[in-house]
A protein has these predicted regions:
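Segments forming oxygen-rich coordination pockets for charged ligands
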Residues: 1-68, 75-76, 99-103, 185-220
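Short, well-ordered alpha-helical microsegments
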Residues: 49-50, 113-115, 138
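Short amphipathic alpha-helical segments
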Residues: 53-55, 77-78, 97, 116-120, ...
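ADP-ribose/adenylate-binding Rossmann-like module
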Residues: 66, 103-110, 119-144
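Short loop/helix-cap segments at secondary-structure boundaries that form the rim of catalytic
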Residues: 72-82
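Conserved SAM-binding strand-loop segment of SAM-dependent methyltransferases
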Residues: 82-88
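Short amphipathic alpha-helix with an adjacent loop that forms part of the alpha/beta core around
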Residues: 90-100
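Adenosine-phosphate binding glycine-rich loop
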Residues: 132-196
Length: 220
């Protein structure tokens, strides 16, 4: 069957996002994708979450931290967080909107909120969803989600156990492995991230100059 114009356009756009190139006749046009600044949503305010938030902020993420214990999401504990939310993880869908370009890190206390977080996240769009835990804990959670009706593709989209296998044991080392995996996924396809203020100016039609840095040398 022939592709409709809509289907062809959708495929062309998808190919452009995937490869960074779109073919028009005999010409190739290079495409640069702009997205909103990435949001790092950390579910659980324990020891690992603190360095995850610190590294995430250094990497330019908007930081949201949620925990069911009020004293674990204080400004003193997470000064770098843009949002600090207290609530039962069952209320995640109510407390946290389905942001565009969201990166979820699930590190709940004793894994008690893992399933609730997973249910909510798998029902919304996400750029990344990682969950901490041993292979046994992860397997149990996966089986539970499959039994609840989530597809294998959905469950397999979870990065669990979370992080790159660098053998870290300390909270800071685990945080490095988590954020290293996130950076790896984020850079798998080149994106240019647009600050919210810049995006607002573009929408309002404000004048400006677009500059693309082609090469950096030294400590620039």
């Amino acid at each position: 069957a022939k592709e409709t114009a809509g289907e062809l356009l959708k495929k062309t756009v998808a190919d452009a996002v995937e490869t960074g190139v779109v073919k028009v006749g005999n010409q190739e046009i290079f495409v640069e994708t702009y997205e909103k600044n990435p949001r790092l949503v950390i579910l659980g305010g324990g020891h690992v979450s603190i360095p995850v938030a610190e590294i995430g902020k250094l990497l330019g993420f908007h930081i949201t931290v949620m925990d069911d214990r009020e004293d674990f999401v204080t400004k003193e504990r997470f000064p770098q967080a843009d949002e600090r939310i207290t609530g039962d993880f069952e209320t995640l869908s109510e407390k946290i909107p389905p942001y565009e370009n969201a990166w979820y890190v699930v590190v709940t206390r004793g894994h008690l909120g893992d399933s609730a977080c997973a249910r909510a996240i798998l029902k919304r769009p996400f750029a990344y969803f990682g969950m901490i835990g041993s292979k046994t804990k992860v397997r149990i959670t996966r089986e539970k989600l499959l039994a609840e009706g989530f597809t294998e593709d959905q469950v397999n989209s979870i990065h669990a156990p979370i992080g790159l296998p660098i053998g870290g044991q300390m909270p800071a080392e685990i945080a490095v492995s988590i954020m290293a995996e996130i950076v790896q996924e984020k850079n798998r396809h080149f994106r240019t991230y647009c600050d919210e203020e810049v995006e607002a100016a573009i929408r309002l039609g404000a004048a400006g100059t677009m500059v693309t840095i082609m090469e950096k040398k030294g400590s620039s």
